[in-house]
């Protein structure tokens, strides 16, 4: 339940340190427990679960409680707001290191950096395992599916088209995608539409025909036979 998760986070926060020495980067700190609590309460307060009308129509009261609260309660938003404020207060007053990332000057470069640099002080908790250029972990976790060769390593995770469609265009309007079933569209047309998206998309997703590491000048393309390697 939400109460159980919140209670566990609060208990953990009472015992976790604010930071570790650099060699232990990635271990859970107090702020991570506070942030998880804040996220749980934010989800709980959202219309998905905090609503008079459930996202799945059910008549069984027990089943209704399994998919969300039985009714809307505005106080859940107050709990979520207070929990998120506690994370900000911890970052500013207790952590000694957690702050908004303000370098480099270009905001898009800063946005990209949080995806590739686990040491960015804006990140409270990161995955930690990035690997090296020899073990392939970095590529497997960072590259879209099918750009890595199969060999003896698993296919990595990829950004889905549904995820891509969540991004608006640079002008703040929704992108219009060509999705008529059974209809083929020129590859260049799809590329052009991707190029119109919010810069944050290109700072966090690697797509065919783009630079691996923005500004490097090195452009890669995906191939149907999966024979492209980095």
Each language-model region and where it sits:
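Flexible helix-coil transition and linker loops at the boundaries of alpha-helical arrays
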Residues: 15-26
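Conserved catalytic neighborhood of penicillin-recognizing serine enzymes
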Residues: 1-7
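Hydrophobic alpha-helical packing residues
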Residues: 9-12, 87
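An aromatic- and glycine-enriched ligand-binding surface/loop that stacks and positions planar moieties
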Residues: 2, 27-34, 41-229
């Amino acid at each position: 339940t939400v109460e159980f998760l919140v209670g566990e986070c609060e208990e953990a926060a009472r015992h976790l340190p604010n930071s570790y020495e650099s060699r232990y980067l990635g271990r859970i700190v107090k702020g991570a427990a506070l942030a998880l609590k804040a996220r749980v309460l934010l989800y709980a307060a959202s219309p998905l679960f905090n609503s008079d009308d459930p996202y799945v129509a059910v008549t069984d009261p027990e089943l209704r409680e399994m998919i969300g609260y039985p009714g809307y309660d505005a106080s859940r938003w107050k709990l979520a707001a207070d929990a998120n404020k506690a994370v900000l207060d911890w970052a500013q007053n207790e952590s000694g290191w957690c702050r908004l990332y303000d370098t480099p000057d270009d905001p898009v470069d800063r946005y990209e950096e949080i995806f590739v640099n686990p040491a960015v002080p804006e990140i409270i908790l990161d995955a930690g395992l990035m690997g090296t250029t020899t073990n392939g972990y970095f590529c497997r976790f960072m590259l879209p599916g099918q750009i890595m060769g199969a060999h003896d390593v698993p296919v990595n995770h990829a950004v889905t088209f549904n995820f891509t469609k969540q991004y608006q265009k640079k002008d703040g309007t929704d992108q219009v995608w060509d999705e008529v079933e059974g209809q083929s569209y020129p590859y260049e047309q799809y590329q052009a539409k991707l190029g119109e998206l919010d810069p944050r998309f290109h700072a966090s997703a690697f797509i065919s025909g783009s630079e691996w590491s923005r500004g490097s000048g090195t452009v890669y393309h995906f191939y149907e036979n999966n024979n492209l390697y980095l």
